[in-house]
């Protein structure tokens, strides 16, 4: 069953807010901007993560220098799952942030 438009937007909004909170509470030197539903996280080394919503597909997209990743929400687990690799969003972010910033953050709740 596909997510309703309202549920999809609520989930993406909550996910982006949780990401902002987590990054704000970290010791990382970064800048964030959330504009028109797109969350951009810029690290001090120039790399960035871009989170955007793809409403027609009901997906959360992540752009990183290593590529683009499309996540579907799994109602059973309550997690975003990459359609290509089946990796959880939180697991992928832990790896990417470690590679980009050298800090381990806990994205288990994402």
Curated annotation (Swiss-Prot):
<dbReference type="InterPro" id="IPR047584">
    <property type="entry name" value="CyaY"/>
</dbReference>
<dbReference type="Pfam" id="PF01491">
    <property type="entry name" value="Frataxin_Cyay"/>
</dbReference>
<dbReference type="InterPro" id="IPR036524">
    <property type="entry name" value="Frataxin/CyaY_sf"/>
</dbReference>
<dbReference type="GO" id="GO:0016226">
    <property type="term" value="P:iron-sulfur cluster assembly"/>
</dbReference>
<keyword id="KW-0479">Metal-binding</keyword>
<dbReference type="InterPro" id="IPR002908">
    <property type="entry name" value="Frataxin/CyaY"/>
</dbReference>
<dbReference type="InterPro" id="IPR020895">
    <property type="entry name" value="Frataxin_CS"/>
</dbReference>
<protein>
    <recommendedName>
        <fullName>Iron-sulfur cluster assembly protein CyaY</fullName>
    </recommendedName>
</protein>
<comment type="function">
    <text>Involved in iron-sulfur (Fe-S) cluster assembly. May act as a regulator of Fe-S biogenesis.</text>
</comment>
<dbReference type="GO" id="GO:0008199">
    <property type="term" value="F:ferric iron binding"/>
</dbReference>
<keyword id="KW-0408">Iron</keyword>
<dbReference type="GO" id="GO:0008198">
    <property type="term" value="F:ferrous iron binding"/>
</dbReference>
<dbReference type="GO" id="GO:0005829">
    <property type="term" value="C:cytosol"/>
</dbReference>
<comment type="similarity">
    <text>Belongs to the frataxin family.</text>
</comment>
């Amino acid at each position: 069953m596909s997510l309703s438009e309202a549920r999809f937007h609520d989930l993406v909004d909550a996910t982006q807010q949780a990401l902002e909170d987590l990054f704000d509470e970290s010791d990382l030197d970064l800048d964030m901007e959330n504009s028109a539903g797109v969350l951009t996280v810029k690290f001090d080394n120039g790399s960035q993560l871009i989170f955007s919503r793809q409403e027609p597909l009901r997906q959360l997209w992540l752009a990183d220098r290593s590529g683009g990743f499309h996540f579907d929400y799994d109602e059973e687990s309550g997690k975003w799952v990459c359609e290509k690799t089946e990796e959880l969003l939180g697991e992928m972010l832990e790896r990417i942030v470690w590679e980009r910033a050298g800090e381990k953050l806990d994205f288990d709740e994402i």
